[in-house]
Amino acid sequence: MSDVTSAGDDVLFVGTDKGLFRIAALDAGAPRLEGPFLAGHRVLHVVPTPGRPRELFAAIDHPVWGAHVHLSGDGGEHWTSLEAAPHHPAGRHANPLDSIWHLARTPDGRRLYAGIDPAGLFFSDDDGASWQDVTSLNEHSTRGAWEPSRGLFALHSICIDRQDPAHLVVGISAGGVYRSHDGGVTWLPANQGVRAEHLPERFPVAGHNVHRVIMHPRDGRRLYRQCYNGTYRSDDGGARWTEITAGLPSDFGYAIACDPENPDVVLQIPESSSHMRTTVDGRLRVYRSDDAGHHWRSVSEGLPQRHVYVTVLRDAMDADPLHAGRYAFGTSSGHVFLTRARGDGWALLAEFLPRVLCVRFCSWSGHRG
């Protein structure tokens, strides 16, 4: 077993198209790159269990064996494929399960949620041994407005309010954002104030192509969303949204992360239009707002600024919940960058890995905040 699993340091998991990597000793002069684990598998998401930091669940996809949830009990060193997988009932879609996009744990660690393609939300109360369909969302009256977007039709973002776990917010591409205040018994569309320029109605109730939704860990009222048409903030748990795109070089992007201590501090990586889908002007730039999106500035020192045509995907950026100011992101070219100062200076952690699908901070001595 690698010494990282017996050490007290923190690690960054990097899920890629060809397996899972682990970067340890983040505070050392020479961080250690380990892996690949789950070699040959697409690792779309990784989530630890609160209170059991070395227990990890991963959303996995393979061209032969399909989509599964995998479990590790030793910090990612060894993995077991769980027999059960979340899927729609036969006949509802052409394929009950194409891929598993996102996993989320309730603060007490008792429930595991999964978002899948075709778009649907599922939960397990027995650590993935069995799954239940959240029918109230998956058969919502507005589902007729949902549709695939460039081949993707997934529920890709799951936010759980840590102060009120019955408050849930999810993002669907392309379906929009939905919220529940009763643990998923009932759901309301949460898209008021959000543009949908690709639809006949500019401000529809549902059907939006949302790329990412995040909730502040200390204040479930504060949400941010990256969309096909703009970046937005909500101050009331998703009931209403304010566009905060002004000051950014584009209104398109995927990756966004908020500061775990200050809900007004948010970082994001804009991309160039819905057609190019790479960094704007061939420059890898991160933008930060310190006032909830009223103003933005580039915080890109240490990042390449010439002929960089890469993509940073929706789960490929993360904020460290236990170390204020530490963020990481990975690119489609397999480069991973880290900052310890909210973007004021970036360092290269790894390069030329397979395409990065997700990054996730974890701590052996603590828990995912």
Q: Which positions does each model-derived feature cover?
A:
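Extracellular glycan-interacting surfaces
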Residues: 1-369
